[in-house]
């Protein structure tokens, strides 16, 4: 995994609802998080120098701020842990990427942003890639989130069972294979919605985005402020694009995927 400064640009936007006094006092918070995306891969920074544009992402920069200095963690798990826990990963042990079957994950004693915002009356949801633990005890819904719908690892780990070299022994897969896409709730309900196959990778970000929008709408209807952490799987290898985006830029898979991601941000 590349260093975090090349892995995840964080797009943070506060959406202010005006329907109630509580929403006016407490802003809705939506964090949009990409994967394996360098600062120079958005046209807000490269000014079109990479041969494609990301107008929806750029609009957030235009209405907010562009960061010119940054400190980054060395891996996906470490960076996500630093953000959601507010601690240096060496304190929590979340320094390397978590793999299927590992006991590594968010420790019980470490509060998350979700924990703190729930105390302030927020509805808390996490959608998309998590990578902060494989076991039920590590799921976001056991660490301050009302709802989680997402995958637990990087994409190349998800598609390993489809490769020719992956062990075919069912016992091996049960012990060490990746879990499917998980949908869980704070009341303890956990549903495995099936594997994140190569085919599902093409549209899974749309699944996650749809669930996130549904969650936000429900919070607004309930007159509750929300905190949503939306984690796209783009652009981690291996990236499987929707057919309509393949070749859309004419300059390669990565640019095509950035256009797809930008459209999802705009939706």
Protein language model features and the residues they cover:
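Formylglycine-dependent sulfatase
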Residues: 2, 6, 20-267
């Amino acid at each position: 995994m590349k260093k975090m400064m090349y892995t995840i640009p964080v797009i943070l936007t506060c959406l202010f609802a005006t329907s109630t006094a509580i929403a006016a006092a407490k802003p809705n918070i939506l964090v949009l998080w990409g994967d394996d995306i360098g600062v120079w891969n958005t046209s807000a920074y490269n000014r079109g120098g990479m041969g494609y544009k990301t107008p929806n992402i750029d609009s957030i920069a235009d209405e907010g701020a562009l960061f010119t200095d940054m400190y980054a963690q060395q891996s996906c798990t470490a960076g996500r842990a630093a953000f959601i826990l507010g601690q240096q990963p060496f304190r929590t042990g979340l320094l390397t990427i978590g793999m299927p079957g590992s006991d590594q994950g968010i420790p019980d004693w470490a509060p998350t942003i979700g924990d703190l915002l729930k105390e302030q009356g927020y509805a808390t949801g996490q959608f998309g890639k998590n990578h902060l633990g494989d076991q039920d005890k590590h799921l976001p819904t056991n660490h301050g989130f009302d709802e989680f719908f997402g995958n637990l690892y990087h994409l190349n780990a998800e598609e390993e069972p489809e490769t020719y070299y992956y062990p075919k022994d069912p016992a091996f897969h049960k012990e060490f294979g990746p879990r499917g896409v998980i949908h869980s709730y704070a009341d303890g309900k956990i549903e495995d919605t099936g594997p994140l196959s190569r085919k599902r990778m093409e549209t899974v970000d749309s699944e996650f985005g749809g669930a996130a929008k549904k969650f936000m709408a429900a919070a607004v209807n309930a007159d509750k402020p929300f905190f949503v952490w939306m984690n796209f799987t783009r652009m981690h290898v291996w990236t499987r694009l929707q057919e309509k985006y393949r070749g859309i830029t004419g300059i390669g898979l990565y640019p095509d995927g950035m256009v797809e991601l930008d459209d999802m941000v705009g939706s």
